[in-house]
Amino acid sequence: MEVAIALREQPEIRELFEVLEGNGLKKERQEVESLVNYLEGMESQFGEVIKELKEVRGQLEQIQDRGIKATAARLLDSAEGKVQEIGTQIAFVKTNLVRSAKNAVHDFKEKGVDALRRAVSAMKIPAALSALKESLHSGMESMERNAAKIGIVGGELNRAAQHTKNAGRALIGRRIKEPAEP
C-alpha cells in the first residue's frame, strides 16, 4: 500500500510556507496553515469513519431478518455515499491547494511579494474553510439521521423479539416478562 505524503510535507506547500515566512506575510501563512490543518484533520476523521462503516457493514451481515437487513443496508449505503462525497471534496481541495501553492510561488519568483500576496488572497481560504465546514456539517447531519433510523429499527426488532418470546410463554402458561425500555 502506497503511503501518501502529508499535505504539509508536500514540496509545494513547504515552499509556500518558506516564501510566506521569509517575506513577512504572517497572516497569509496562518491562513494557509489553518486550511492545511483543517484538511489534515478531516482526512484523519475520514479514515476513521470509513473504518467504522466497514465494521457496521460486517455487523449488518449478522442480521437475519431480510426486511430489516435491506432497510439497514439502504441506510448504510446512503451514509457511505455521503462519506465518499466528503472524501472527494477533501481530495479536490487538497489538489487545488497544492496547485495554488505552486502557482503562488511561481508568481512570487516572477513578480515579487505583491504577486504572492494577491495569489494567496485569490485562494479565498476563509471562504474555502467555511464551505468545507458547511458541507461536512450537512453530511454529518445526514449520517446522524441515518444512524438514528438504524438505532430505531434495531430497538423495534429487539422489542418484537421480546413480544414473540412473551407469546410463547403465554402459550405454555408461564408469566410474561415486561419489555425492557431502550
Describe the residue ranges of each PLM region.
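Leu/Val/Ala/Ile-rich N-terminal alpha-helices, chiefly Sec-type signal peptides and the beginnings
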Residues: 1-84, 88-91
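Membrane- and interface-active hydrophobic/amphipathic segments that mediate membrane binding, fusion
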Residues: 57, 64-179
